[in-house]
Amino acid sequence: MTERTFSIIKPDATRRNLTGAINAVIEAAGLRIVAQRRVKLTEAQAKKFYEVHAERPFYGELVGQMTAEPVVVQVLQGDNAVLKYREVMGATNPENADEGTIRKLFALSIGENSVHGSDSLENAGIEIAQFFTEDEIVG
């Protein structure tokens, strides 16, 4: 089933000019990038996006990291896009990620793990709508 999912290429990766390399891994996995934009998140945007983690001890650091430098927000499309992208990203901790995954290839640490991907189809819709209108998605 064709789905859409949301991706963020995080500051640790954009700082190292890895957007193209990460996009190549995404596309090699059969996912299409149907919307993409480089943005600098405001504190309010980052807090809203990560509000599910608001009570966690790493929340403040996460918001700080995500607003420090630009990110690349994306909409990815393909068969079973949510699950496929989660597989392509690899485990949150790059030490546990499978070879060839984005996090194994590019992440610096569990905190600087290069990418975010939606964890469900429902959340993908919510996350996409925070950054893109339907007219901006060309698929």
UniProtKB/Swiss-Prot annotation:
Essential cofactor(s): Mg(2+)
Domain of life according to the entry:
Bacteria
- Has UniProt tagged this entry with the keyword Chaperone? no
Describe the reaction catalysed, as an equation. Answer: a 2'-deoxyribonucleoside 5'-diphosphate + ATP = a 2'-deoxyribonucleoside 5'-triphosphate + ADP; a ribonucleoside 5'-diphosphate + ATP = a ribonucleoside 5'-triphosphate + ADP
Gene3D superfamilies, per the entry: Nucleoside diphosphate kinase-like domain
Please name the CDD domains in this protein's record: NDPk_I
Q: Which GO MF terms does the UniProt record name?
A: ATP binding; metal ion binding; nucleoside diphosphate kinase activity
What compartments host this protein?
Answer: Cytoplasm
- One record GO biological process: UTP biosynthetic process
What keywords are annotated for this sequence in UniProt?
ATP-binding, Cytoplasm, Kinase, Magnesium, Metal-binding, Nucleotide metabolism, Nucleotide-binding, Phosphoprotein, Transferase
Please describe the quaternary structure of this protein: Homotetramer.
Q: What biological function has been recorded for the protein in this entry?
A: Major role in the synthesis of nucleoside triphosphates other than ATP. The ATP gamma phosphate is transferred to the NDP beta phosphate via a ping-pong mechanism, using a phosphorylated active-site intermediate.
Q: Which family does it belong to?
A: Belongs to the NDK family.
Annotated protein name in UniProt = Nucleoside diphosphate kinase
